[in-house]
Amino acid sequence: MALMITDECINCDVCEPECPNGAISQGDETYVIEPSLCTECVGHYETSQCVEVCPVDCIIKDPSHEETEDELRAKYERITGEG
């Protein structure tokens, strides 16, 4: 399942540099996560780094992009060319 940033985002910019896949960018009003690039840090880290650093806990699982651990790993391999 990809992650998403809720409208509670305060645009503090701490999440964007933490994403190893470059999935986070500045949107019109808040930061956004590109679901096709978000692996919840599977393949890179044990936990989602953006969630760890967010000071307002506004990064949650995106219910419209449900994925299994295997699907996230396959996405990681596709993005990085590893596997």
UniProtKB/Swiss-Prot annotation:
Cofactor: [4Fe-4S] cluster
Domain 4Fe-4S ferredoxin-type, chain residue ranges per copy: 2-29, 31-64
Pfam families membership: Fer4_7 (PF12838)
Keywords: 4Fe-4S, Electron transport, Iron, Iron-sulfur, Metal-binding, Repeat, Transport
Disulfide bonds: none
Superkingdom in the source lineage: Bacteria
Residues engaged in binding [4Fe-4S] cluster 2: C19, C38, C41, C50
Gene Ontology terms, MF aspect: 4 iron, 4 sulfur cluster binding; metal ion binding
Binding site for [4Fe-4S] cluster 1: C9, C12, C15, C54
GO cellular component, one term: cytoplasm
Note on cofactor: Binds 2 [4Fe-4S] clusters.
UniProt-listed SUPFAM superfamilies: 4Fe-4S ferredoxins (SSF54862)
Purpose of the protein: Ferredoxins are iron-sulfur proteins that transfer electrons in a wide variety of metabolic reactions.
NCBIfam families: di_4Fe-4S_YfhL
PANTHER family in alphabetical order: PHOTOSYSTEM I IRON-SULFUR CENTER, PHOTOSYSTEM I IRON-SULFUR CENTER-RELATED
Protein name as it appears in the record: Ferredoxin
